[in-house]
Amino acid sequence: MAAPTSMANADGESTRTGYCAATKSFRSLRPPVPLPPPDVPLSFPEFAFSLLPRSSSSSSSSLLPANPALVDAATGEAVSFQAFLSRVRALAGALRSRVGLRGGDVAFVLAPAGLDVPVLYFALLSIGAVVSPANPALTPAEVSRLVSLSGASVAFAVSSTATKLPAGLTTVVLLDSPHFRSLLMDCGQAQGQEPLPVVVVRQSETAAIQYSSGTTGRVKAAALPHRSFIAMVAGFHALRAKAREVRTLLGAPMFHSMGFLFVLQGVALGATTVVVTDAVARAGIRGLVEAAERWAVMDMTASPPVVLGMTKQRCRLPALERITCGGAPLPAPAIERFRRRFPHVDLCMGYGSTEAGGISRMISQEECNHIGSAGRVTENVEVKIVDHVTGKPLPAGQQGELWVRGPAVMTGYVGDNEANATTFNSEGWLKTGDLCYIDQDGFLFVVDRLKELIKYKAYQVPPAELELVLHSLPQIVDAAVMPYPHEEAGQIPVALVVKQPGSKLTEAEVMYNVAKQVAPYKKIRKVLFVDSIPKSPSGKILRRELVNHLRLCELSRL
């Protein structure tokens, strides 16, 4: 039977793929979501609070949602929406009048997840300050590098992380101090003091500086405007469940771009965000699962390692309806295991980046059935697939570098004109550096990072493709594929493999089973058995650490 033909709409776009022959780009198949005019002054908090659904328990339209805005997953302490707004307003005023923050000031945040962190984010954003969150587990040297990159003048930390901050910061505020508690309860202007002028924040102004992962190169600081978060949250708002309370377990770190977004989104949608504090996180995946059960959450954000680990936990999670997963690829065998273990849960894969925001995601049960894809292109987003050698745009079904254009894209890297020049083209397209393709049904597939392609003779071998094959082998727990220098071939693919406990799997068996499933030039040429694969909190393989590991290994036979 012939494949169904792709129809075109009035604009000449394929109704199946979104490909437009005139522009040689793919547009989202989803209905466009209206956004505020870009020249209208509007901070993200203003936009978020305007979206809040009103309580159905009263005829008064002024009442906020009756459910809590935030719940501590460990203690059960809750913050109502009324209390949340009151704290945000009090803190915003105190940050201006008592701390001296002004619009454009960069605030470095080095604090573990807690109920005060979302309040701090919203307060900073509402006065036009720039939020720059970082991983509290970083070393002092790493923290110093990020503070320097962002140009932060003030830092918010806790007692245990403040010692990592470099000297030279104008102000350091500890979230676990009486001083900060007094800022949260600030009652306004002191008697006789001149009132502060009203803050006007434009959508084009920087809201956050977030750091690229640095898994494959030096860390860079991406500046994201208020409009970026307005656009992303508007898309989620258009799909929100009407007239019901939604409880979401925030399984992504608050400093991570995904966790940061979902903190903002949860408030804007009137959902209850169950915050995973250190007390829960220390218990690992078991702690997350127990929190999901205890609070009967319907939604959950999770990285691939968490999704993998959930299949090994003894739990049912009857209330759970959806998991949003992103940050790194999830092998098809792992997805199949999850679906068998939790058939009532939609595992919604998504794809995005710190620099581009959300690029694609799954939004329905039908879309979740397209295993291996990252969903369809997000509303209001336009992408191109470009041959990375010739620069020629490609149609559906062909692999090339993914370029993105849309309202959620970053303004640029802070203080790095060289990186900006290579990342953006003259028409505003952001080059992701990811090798992708869009299939005949409009689903986006991420093949690999272009920088990570292994140059074997005249061929390019995607490590992620080989990693998926390795993950499909029953005796392998985890795996990574790396290039290794070779005199004749240039580079050869080397697999680092974590075996199942007690497995007697051999190097020859691994190489044989992979060779049966790939083209000859993609074959694994060497296998090293290791105890673990180093990964970031989001599940990305830390390839730089593996490079060091390979250097230490004896590879004289290659």
Swiss-Prot record:
One MF annotation (Gene Ontology) recorded for this entry: trans-cinnamate-CoA ligase activity
Region annotation (SBD1) ranges: 284-349
EC nos: 6.2.1.12
Gene Ontology biological-process annotations: phenylpropanoid metabolic process
Top-level taxonomic group: Eukaryota
Record protein name field: 4-coumarate--CoA ligase-like 7
Similarity section: Belongs to the ATP-dependent AMP-binding enzyme family.
PANTHER family: 4-COUMARATE--COA LIGASE-LIKE 7, LONG-CHAIN-FATTY-ACID--COA LIGASE
Keyword Transcription: no
Binding sites annotated in the UniProt record for ATP: 212-216, 220, 350, 354, 434, 449, 540
Needed cofactors: Mg(2+)
